[in-house]
């Protein structure tokens, strides 16, 4: 099995040496035996014995080697964000584009379970092959992120809100990576709560350092803080999952009963919330925006 480890988790040219039932038999560059389920082969593909084709090689749960032409988002040499399918006591199960899911072991996740990723979050990972030829997800280290992020060496992003994901959590602060490749650090004094590992967040940029890394904040600007009426509406929106059946044409009596304010005060308050992009006003309802949710203190 020692030779097999050289090709597991990577893209290789394999020779087609036979067909056994519905399974193609392939041979690796070092003579490794690899199987390919016929269900993994596109209808237009017609493999010829003795010819070599490009495949991704992965182990099944028993350690036997299988191949696929559906190239995954990550390999043992490539990092990318992978979607979390579920979490359990073993860790986080992720989808990397293979016929089987891949586990990020619990030992690699935060010590506080409330900071573990949830289904739908994305983890920055690569593939790791252990001594028993099993395949796991490995979280990106700080060294890896430093080698791949896009530096920003000016103030062009100042006070801009950027979508990013948490890839590393420490007591001193949260480390984020955006879709554009920006690396962002949020000091613990600039957050009300800590995001989950892999959670998508909106972060306001407040500066940068000499390495081109951005500094961010989860706290609103002073002029974005809400007045009393706005805070009442915001708190109720959070309590009712981000949606309330009220708008500027709702009856004064209904507004008074629910919000304990006049219709004029209500209209002014939702107008301010809308201008700050904290809510959307739709026919018959108001809803929290992504920016609005980013203000929530869990």
Curated annotation (Swiss-Prot):
Pfam family, one: CvfB_WH
Domain of life according to the entry: Bacteria
InterPro entries given in the database record: CvfB_fam, CvfB_S1_2nd, CvfB_S1_3rd, CvfB_S1_st, CvfB_WH, NA-bd_OB-fold, WH-like_DNA-bd_sf
Similarity comment: family membership: Belongs to the CvfB family.
Descriptive protein name: Conserved virulence factor B
